[in-house]
Design a protein with these regions (language model features):
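Hydrophobic alpha-helical transmembrane segments of multi-pass inner membrane proteins, especially
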Residues: 18-24, 28, 32, 42-237, ...
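Long extracytoplasmic/lumenal interhelical loops at the membrane interface
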Residues: 253-295
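Transmembrane alpha-helices of multi-pass inner-membrane enzymes
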Residues: 347-385
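Short, Lys/Arg-enriched, Gly/Pro-containing loop segments at transmembrane-helix junctions
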Residues: 382-394
């Protein structure tokens, strides 16, 4: 048995099966949300489910490659990856394509790419090395506050670059950073101080950083959850949140059936009132709730929760701190996306356009998601393989990371 095949057999297949189940359900949900759309436009919305399958097929080799290669490469590749991520964000500011007020995409060879997704992927890798390896590489960084400053710069620069144009991608950095900080041996008092400082900054960001339409979305959500419906502009910023809530609330336990089969003339809410270009991406959870009901939504969230719990389990078995931090960062990112997407589809959180992992349509996000799943698998596959050898020099043990 070759070492590579042995690694392949050592993959966490329960996690793979859970992921494949979510991906299959996501493709089916996208089909439900888009197959009936007009096919005369250049977007070909009725074929989005096929496009999603292509993106999955493109991303699976990245998953397999990342899983079978020992993740120790992140120690030397983290800086180039991070700089490339920042370079992508700079390119976005210069040549980005603005869609519905969001400057989040660049067009490369006719394909829209979202640099912020690659930036957060690189950021997770960089933060794992900062929290896990920096104290060993330079003893001065054994002081927690120094590591926190470096990590804050690593996360703060890309977050600040995207938050004004792409609020959702900017906010994802928060839970990712806090989760990795918690696992990265930073004293709890520093986390409390950081959270309190962030709370003080929120009003400044709201009034002086966010655009008017972003403020309006936050205001609309606040009015809806506090039952001030007279202040909600149902023909403007409150249009989509209102109809998404109606779609979810009217679904019942069993829903209106796949392809809206239980509704006369298939006249479901999502077909009539959801934005045609976003029903299969940002509002896919609302479509699932309406089509498959409460049980479908619970089944979906249970599947995602099972995947995240398995990720946490894998983190406990990591051979080193870097692997543990990688897994925690990925789990935190998936949780943030799931929490925000489900929350905005239920009318509990503002509409800021974060895709639902494994379910929402999206090329860039799908490839990043599958690559990060591969990184999690690499931590599991190599959990019993020592990344270093012990050597003795002058009667004292030290580690040599260049040996395998």
């Amino acid at each position: 048995m070759t070492p590579l095949f042995k690694k392949f057999l050592g993959i966490n297949w329960i996690l793979i099966l859970t992921m494949l189940g979510l991906l299959a359900f996501g493709v089916y949900a996208i089909y439900n949300a888009s197959y009936f759309r007009d096919d005369s436009g250049v977007l070909k919305l009725h074929l989005k489910w096929k496009d999603q399958m292509k993106w999955i097929g493109l991303g699976l080799p990245f998953l397999l490659g990342a899983a079978l290669i020992d993740y120790k490469w992140v120690r030397w590749a983290c800086v180039p990856m991070y700089m490339a991520g920042l370079g992508g964000l700079v390119y976005l500011q210069l040549y980005g394509v603005e869609v519905k007020g969001n400057l989040a995409w660049v067009t490369i060879a006719g394909v829209n790419v979202q640099p912020s997704q690659f930036a957060i992927m690189a950021g997770i890798v960089m933060l794992a090395v900062v929290f896990g390896e920096l104290p060993r590489m330079w003893p001065v960084f054994r002081r927690p506050w120094l590591r926190l400053i470096v990590a804050g710069i690593v996360a703060g620069i890309p977050a600040a670059m995207v938050i004004k144009e792409d609020l959702g991608s900017g906010l994802v950095w928060g839970p990712v950073f806090l989760s990795m900080m918690l696992v990265g041996s930073i004293p709890f008092r520093y986390m409390i101080t950081l959270i309190l400082g962030a709370l003080c900054i929120i009003p400044i960001v709201y009034f002086f950083v966010l655009k008017p339409y972003q403020q309006a979305r936050i205001d609309t959500t606040w009015y809806m959850i506090t039952n001030q419906m007279d202040k909600v502009d149902t023909r403007g910023d409150g249009w989509v949140p209102t109809f998404v809530q109606i779609a979810v609330a009217s679904a019942g336990f069993e829903g209106k059936g796949p392809m809206s089969e239980k509704v006369p003339d298939h006249g479901t809410i999502h077909r009539q009132f959801f934005p045609s270009t976003e029903a299969h991406s940002d509002f896919i959870f609302g479509v699932i709730c309406e089509e498959f009901g409460f049980r479908g939504a619970v089944l979906l969230l249970t599947g995602i929760a099972l995947l995240l719990i398995q990720g946490i389990f894998m983190a406990f078995y990591s051979r080193d701190q870097v692997g543990r931090l990688l897994v925690v960062g990925v789990v935190a990112m998936f949780f943030a996306h799931t929490f925000q997407n489900a929350g905005m589809n239920l009318g509990m959180l503002p509409v800021i356009g974060l895709p639902l992992p494994f379910i929402s349509y999206g090329g860039t996000f799908m490839i990043v998601t599958l690559f990060l799943m591969g990184m999690m698998q690499s931590v599991w596959v190599h959990r019993n393989i020592s990344p270093v050898k012990r050597k003795t020099m002058g009667g004292r043990d030290f580690r040599d990371d260049d040996d395998d």
